[in-house]
Amino acid sequence: MALRESGEDYLESIYVLSERQGIVRSIDVAEYLGVTKASVSKAMATLESNGYVEMGKRDVHLTERGLEVARQMWERHCFFVGLLEDAGVSAEVASQEGCHMEHCLSEESFEKLRAML
């Protein structure tokens, strides 16, 4: 199953939170993304059934498959945010727009763009 943008955002948020604090709970993801805990529960069920995350009693972990996608999304996010900030875009706008940009390019286009810059 191909991930939607929202699924990629959930994986990326778990990755970022796990790097910051180690253990990641559903409530942490909800607060990070600004969504309800019910939304996180639904998304986690879908991501777990597709092999991207494993749910523990109190926490959530990325599988190897989920970690691969999350790292890729975070790498793209950082690239686009940095590019926009270097162009003079405010940090807040760069973060919001970088989040959208990270999802819309193919791997080939992203690699070519990154190599060019």
What are these regions (language model features)?
Residues R20-G22, E75, D86:
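Helix-turn-helix/winged-helix DNA-binding modules
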Residues A2-V35:
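N-terminal helix-turn-helix DNA-binding core of bacterial DNA-binding proteins
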Residues R58-R76:
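Basic, amphipathic "hinge/linker" alpha-helix immediately C-terminal to the N-terminal HTH DNA-binding motif
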Residues C78-L117:
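Amphipathic alpha-helical dimerization/coiled-coil segments
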Residues Y10, V29, V40-E48:
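Basic amphipathic alpha-helical segments that dock to polyanions
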